[in-house]
Amino acid sequence: MTLNEAEIGREYIVSDIETDGDEDMKSFLFSLGCYSGETITVVDKKRNLVVAIKDARYNIDPELADAIKI
């Protein structure tokens, strides 16, 4: 399941990051602290997703959310 399919307010564990070889996207997600085994929570869903990773919140687009498997 991808992060786009996640329920708002529920905590998930990242199982994988699948970027189809896009190293820039993978590096960006890692810089946010988003990697396999990390907890992530969807705070809001509108056009983009607001997610909480560790003690920070980030606004990510649907393409990034599709790369995050939970």
Model-derived regions, located:
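Compact, glycine-rich, soluble single-domain proteins
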Residues: 1-70
